[in-house]
Amino acid sequence: MSFRDRFQNLKETVGQWTDSSGGGSLDRKIERNLAEMEGGTEIERTAAVKALVIQAQTDDKWADPIITSFLRVLPDQLASPQEAIIDGLLELRKIKVSREGEIFESIQETLDSPYPSVRSKVVEIWTRFSLKSDTKTSDTIAVLFEMLSDDDKDVRYQTQESLSKILHTVPKVALPELKNAIGDDDWRVTYHSIVLLTEFAKKYPAPSVVLAPEVIEAFNSGERLKERAADCIGMLGLANPEAVKPAVPGLIKGLEGKSSELRKACATALGRIGSKNGMVVYHAVPRLARALKNDDWYIHVEVVKALGYIGSSKPALVKPHLAIIRNRTTTGADRNICKAAEWALKKAGGG
């Protein structure tokens, strides 16, 4: 059956169950829908839930019993009825404000739902909840950080996007939670948290620097996180080179790593740090010059730019290597390398 047919069936079923004409009182219709919500097919259950929401809004005496039934069956429902119940509970809390606490507690528990679509839905709800002016608490934000360890990639990336909104809206509340997340034992939580901090540091570098020790520790903890952590360290180094100085030996070592992406990220980070204080990265200059001589031309643009940035801060550090930079203005493996070398030569005082 096509999606359109399934949708039409659902629409017709809801219509049948909410139609006031036909046999039976409203009470019997509600009782039938409550039973169908637990024993019908997925489509029938979803339709029953939608009908019950309307019926609870129609007859107040049924609102509490229907909410209670929703809370009871929510954990064990299939994907579509779970989503329908969540939507229904959010609607019914408006008429039963006293039950808001248990409703949100029950919805939060569906973050453990076996269905990625449900988990994604709850992440979106929790994001809205976290951004409300009267509920900007670390507890709700901490729940979202836990979702960065979700087994489903789409859920993780949606959570990352949601946390980015929160981080940019309430940084004072979110940054302490981000700090904890960067130090999490689950590499996925750390990975996504570093990406979040990197983006945040581009706009708000000063408050981000306080997390430099955690990022450096992540960089040194294993290969899985090095590339992203190097990128973040470079951004933090633009704000405060001294804060990331402990990372420089690892970044230098990374220039000779197995991955071209890691070598490129380390070169970029060293250039960013060196653009603000060349002396912090002075040990890296000979290694960068050596990297221009190897066959991995994929990283040469970032390497030569790093030398240019460092040279703009401390020309004397790069002066012994101007010849290799000048050579790459004509012998670079592609035009981008040649142009980057020309730029670097001027920045370092050799052009």
PLM features: residue spans?
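Amphipathic alpha-helical scaffolding segments comprising HEAT/armadillo-like alpha-solenoid repeats
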Residues: 24-35, 60-73, 97-110, 134-147, ...
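Eukaryotic acidic, Ser/Thr-rich intrinsically disordered low-complexity regions
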Residues: 323-351
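N-terminal "cap/leader" segments of large eukaryotic alpha-helical scaffolds
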Residues: 2-46
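Eukaryotic tandem repeat interaction scaffolds
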Residues: 217, 222-293, 298
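Solenoidal tandem-repeat scaffolds enriched in leucines and small polar residues
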Residues: 147, 152-165, 169-172, 177-178, ...
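Alpha-helix N-cap/helix-start positions at coil->helix boundaries
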Residues: 42-43, 79-80, 116-117, 153-154, ...
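Alpha-solenoid HEAT/ARM repeat scaffold
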Residues: 46, 50, 64, 68, ...
